[in-house]
A protein has these predicted regions:
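Conserved beta-strand -> loop -> alpha-helix junction used to position metal-binding or nucleic-acid-contacting
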Residues: 108-158
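RNase H-like, metal-dependent nuclease domains and their acidic two-metal-ion catalytic environment used
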Residues: 1-115, 153-261
Length: 261
């Protein structure tokens, strides 16, 4: 594993917040491993005869049950590996397209270890350009990046279609996505994998495309979280290669640097 990232998606309202997230590990081969997913806050009322309302979280800073305090705990929690050593989340990305001022206050305090992400041209049809970057730095803030949403979702969908047979003793293809065995109520279809089926690609007559939800009832938040976890890793790699003055750098270049080869 080369590094671990986190992607987060803001939902709800300032005083009734839910922040969804996914933690993903990225291997030298290009395969990824989902480590955990979850939500800070919920829109589901507590069950029971008394109908007690759920505990509500807030996007306000410095208040009780602020999502930002809880997110700090999640990001700073060490992650055990199979070899016995601990890893930390290297970088995180938060969707700032909604309730941006709350998110900006948070990312501005993190010195680029956590950056903001915004979808770009989400409603426009896009050409599938293989060499196009998935992001560009925003003119608004140095720690905010504009994500080529349709292009990035297209690439994520391609990775979702990859197949691998573990009985053939061959490496996993680059981009292959690994998921834990469902346990503890996580990684089930209803609360996780259904999010990956919530959107579809729409083609127009010129063979350009865009991605959008199949209908207003479906939930796509964890699909977005996985997308953000991938993009923020690409951003970090690009920043490191730029600082080292490596032009047209690749994932292999980055791995060689961090693995001291």
């Amino acid at each position: 594993i080369v590094f671990v990232t986190l992607g987060a998606d803001m939902n709800g309202k300032p005083d009734d917040a839910r922040l969804d997230y996914e933690i993903v590990a990225w291997s030298e081969s290009g395969a990824s491993y989902s480590i955990n997913h979850g939500s800070i806050g919920t829109f589901i009322p507590r069950e029971g005869a008394n109908g007690i309302d759920r505990e509500r979280w807030t996007y306000h800073h410095g208040m009780e049950r602020s999502v930002w305090t809880e997110l700090d705990k999640i990001i700073n929690e060490p992650i055990p590996t199979d070899s016995g050593h601990l890893m930390q989340i290297m970088t995180s990305g938060i969707d700032c397209g909604y309730l941006r001022d709350y998110a900006y206050q948070y990312i501005d305090s993190k010195d680029f270890t956590i950056v903001g992400l915004k979808g770009k041209d989400t409603d426009k049809f896009t050409m599938n350009m293989k060499d196009a970057k998935s992001f560009k730095q925003s003119l608004e803030k140095p720690n905010l990046y504009m994500v080529e949403t349709n292009l990035t979702k297209e690439r994520l969908a391609s990775k979702m279609r990859l197949k691998w047979n573990d009985k053939l003793n061959v490496p996993q293809p680059s981009g292959f996505m690994n998921f834990p065995t469902p346990s503890g109520g996580k990684y089930l279809f209803n609360n996780y994998f259904s999010h990956y089926e919530a959107e579809h690609r729409i083609l127009d007559k010129t063979n350009t495309f865009k991605w959008e939800k199949k209908n207003d009832m479906v939930q796509n938040h964890l699909f977005d979280c996985r997308l953000y976890a991938g993009v923020v890793g690409e951003i970090m790699v690009a920043r490191v290669l730029k600082e080292l003055k490596i032009t047209n750098g690749t994932w292999k270049n980055y791995c060689d640097i961090v693995l001291d080869r």
